[in-house]
Structures are given as structure tokens and as C-alpha cells.
């Protein structure tokens, strides 16, 4: 900065007379220069312009020289200018001055004030560097990080270069000569004001225009100018969309409807499909339950297959509705994309926007036909398809299987042991025990081909019968006994007595006779489960009923004595 004085403080050297020179020299000797320090900005007067140099006197013994190139506007002799003192006395005895650094110091001071106040500064982006751009702040170079350029990525950075625009100073470090600025902060501040204004006006049902800002797996974020909204995948189209990128592109202009606005969180939910009429309102009439149709397979899922009903509308055939014979059949094994199939409409859910279909119900259920031809009790012969740890699978035709559980192989022997005697492919004779159409299950049995040998035992030793048994074996968990020297029975340890201290198998001996009550019969083995405890409790209750006294003066010992006397 230069200031032209109305009166020249020092006339041109050619006009200075000898007398004035002596007076001026004396005056300089008396001037106090202690306040002038290196690395500071002071005012000086231009005393001569010689060749490419501007000679400036700052009040020191020696004048300083500054290249003309450091001045934006060349001063005149006599002008007062601010200069930066590099060194008071250099190698050649001259004072080293700088006009550029003086201007920069002044600018730094102004920028520091603006930074502390949070004020914006004007600048121009003029270059690209690693990680960002360089900005000219009226002579001071600042760094603009790439992350601080805009609120969203800019495809063509040249569109914002060499244009004077406002910036916000983020940080200043004079020692490192480093200033970091932000263009994004300016945009966000103006955007924040516009955002508040827009949020105050936004309402559900409004139709707005926006730009696709970001695409994710679950939807797309739409820039509405000053605020973003979420367009969920399910609100893009009434038809099926697997990924938003199938119908949307980055920076694409779209028209959307505000379908939900949360005033607390300020979240905006958007929809495109809501701009059109809901096809589901008429779908129920168009596709009534029970209607048979044909359509193409469009997509597979772990739980079923999708079939096109018409353009933009699909229905789901659940895995359980593909075949009568395999409840959770993998659709990829029997169907292909684009394949034409026949199906029937099972349900139209207008709220969840789902159409449930069935392929198998267009065909006759082979299990129903099997049940008609082979009712329960029918004896059949069929080849063994597979043998597992728990039973035998038998081929019934039409890819149907029936199962013989290992417990239904023999009345007497363990089924798990007998499984080893069967081979895959062998023909086996069995009886139809049960048919469950809904669960698609046929239960078969081999042992049912012959009478139950334990049925006679079950008839003779009914539950509650009091019997006498002979102890054949004493075990830790109870007593093995024999009834009528032919039927096996067992008394559990806990059933030996109603007194806990008497529930000890070791108190009994082999060949000792014991009286007990029939509790249950294991039909598969014919073994009878007995209880001494239940027998004693029943006897006690009976005695109380028959011999008890209404005046409660008779004790339990008397009652039992009377009962025993009667038995004699």
C-alpha cells in the first residue's frame, strides 16, 4: 500500500544541497531506531527509483532496495509505503526489505481477524494439488481439501475453478505458512437455511423433483435441493425390483412423492410407485382365488419361485406348493427361468401386496388316489427304497414313499436289530396303518401282519388288577418279577413302598412272593409294570372307608387290625 504525500518529505537527491544533506544526516543520527526490528512491517519513504529497484528509507542508517516486481502499482519518489524488514544490515551493509511480505503480513492479519469472527473470505481456485486444490486469497495461497469442495462429488472440477467465490477459513498456521479453507461449509450453511425453510413446508402427499444422490442395496437417497429423502426399494415400483440400480442412475432427475415425514427425526420417506394408481386395488378382482392360469418363471428364492401374472406383476409359488410328493422341493431342480407353467391362485393379499400361487394343485394328488385304492388295513407289497436308523422307506409308485418305523417291524424283537436283515430293492409285505393327506405321510407296519401276542396278556392283566408275583431278579432300579410263571413284570424302586426308607430293592429276595397292583402294560414288549405302593395306598383307603369310626376315636392300627382279621 502506498500513500502519496502532498509535500515531499525528501526532495530528489539531485536537488538536495550540501547544507541540507548535513542537516538531514544529523537528524538521522538523532532518530531513535530502537523500535525498528527485523521480521516486522514498518513504513518507509521512496527516495529513488533506479533501474529495476525502488530505494526506500525506513529511518535506518542504510536504505533498502526492493525489486519493482514486488509492487502491483509502481510508487513514485516521495511516496510512503509499508515494507517488511528481512534484515536491518545485510552482507553489503544495506537493509534488506520486502514489499511482497509486507502485503502478505497485512493480509494475514486481516484473515486472522475474519477467521476469529467466522466471516467468509473471497478467493479463487487456481490449481490442483495432491488431496485438493490451491486457492488465491488476494495474494495469500490457501489449501482446499477435496472433502471440503462440495456437499456431493463434483464430476468436473474445472467448472468451479478460476471463479471468485466465498470460502470459510478452517485453520491458520503462520509458522508453517498454511491456511486451510472450505467451500463446502459455505454451501452447507446456505443449504441449512434452505433446509429449515423446506422442512417447515413439507407435507405427506407432496410431489417433488429431486436428484439421485446415492444408491444402496435397500434403496436410494434423493437430493431434494436442500434436504435428502430415502426412496426405499419397495417404494420404487409396484412390480418387483431386485436392486435400485435396475431402474435408477446416479444424478438422475426423478419425480417423487412424500409418503412419510417424521417431524421429530426430520426423516423423509419417498416413493415413486405412489405416483401411479395402486394396481392391487383391482388385482383381487382380476385374479380370483381358484383361477387357473399359465405364466413364465421369472425368479427363484430359497422359499419358492416367482411367476409373472402379467407385465409388472408377479406371484409366489411356495416350495411346499410345487409338488405333492416333496414338501420343500428345490424349485431349481424342476423349473427354469422363462419356463411356462400352469398354476392356480390361492390367495391375494392386498395389504402385503402378495399373490400366493400353487402348481401342485393344478394336478391330482396321488396320495388321495392311493388312499382310495389302499385304505387303512390294506396289505401291500412294495420295494424298499431306502433304509435309515429309524426305519424303512418303501416305494409306493408315482414317486411316493411310505415308512415302516423300526418299532413296527416285530412284536418281540428290537426293530433296530432287524433293520440289518433288510436290503435296498427287496420287496417287503406290509400293512397300511395310517394315511395323512395334509402331511403327505403313509405309515406302514410289518408286525401288524400277525396278531399281537401281548393282547391276551393285556386282556387278562388289566390296569388296577391286584396280582401276586414271584421275584426273579433284584436290580438297583427295581425288581424283575414273573406272573403265573409265564408273564414278565417289573416293579420300579420308587413303587416298592409308600415309605421312602423302604424303597430298597435289596430288602427283597429272589423267589419271594410279592403282592402288587397292575399300573400299565408295555404293549410293544408285553411287560407288566407293577406297584406295591399303589396297592398299599388302595388298601389303606379301602380300610378307612369300611372300618373307620365317625367319632375319630379309632386309630389306624385298629382299622388295619380289623381289616386283617376279616381277611382271615
Curated annotation (Swiss-Prot):
S1 motif domain residues are: 39-100, 118-184, 205-273, 290-360, 377-447, 464-533
Could you list this entry's UniProt keywords, alphabetically sorted: Repeat, Ribonucleoprotein, Ribosomal protein, RNA-binding
Q: What's one GO-annotated cellular component?
A: cytosolic small ribosomal subunit
- State which residue ranges cross the membrane: none
Q: Any keyword Ribonucleoprotein? A: yes
**For this chain's UniProt record, which GO biological process terms are given?**
translation
Q: What GO MF terms are annotated?
A: mRNA binding; structural constituent of ribosome
What family does this belong to?
Belongs to the bacterial ribosomal protein bS1 family.
Q: What does this protein do?
A: Binds mRNA; thus facilitating recognition of the initiation point. It is needed to translate mRNA with a short Shine-Dalgarno (SD) purine-rich sequence.
What name appears for this protein in its UniProt entry? Small ribosomal subunit protein bS1
Which organism is the protein's source? Rickettsia felis (strain ATCC VR-1525 / URRWXCal2)
Name the encoding gene, please: rpsA
